[in-house]
Amino acid sequence: DSELEGSVRRMATLLVSGAKITSPHVAIFLRKGYGLGAQAMVGGSFHDPIYTASWPTGEFGGMGLEGAVKLGFRKELEAETDPKKKEDLYNKLVERSYEKGKAIEAAAHLEIDAVIDPSDTRKVILAAVKGF
């Protein structure tokens, strides 16, 4: 549906606008950062803002994780003929994707700078801007 509605075209406008930002910016993810939407909000790269952090509730991925599993593991899922085993495999793969997409994992792999306590958000933003 989103392809028929031209979502990517509209999202490209956000990407271009974000990439043209010349002032320093800080990105704080409260919940989910998936696909082009996340990229648009950080100027095209998680490394473009002067500081990128997430609350512990943050989730990250190149696209929605359920869809990513269906596309990325299509052969494995189609090869399983037993419906119950197929569902179990799918659920296991989705769970693994959620584990890999947690904010703490993104920070551990240097995709973001830190996972912060939500109550420290204002202090973290001010420190990042002052440090610029």
Task: Indicate where each model-derived feature is located.
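Ligand-binding clefts of soluble mixed alpha/beta catalytic domains
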Residues: 1-132
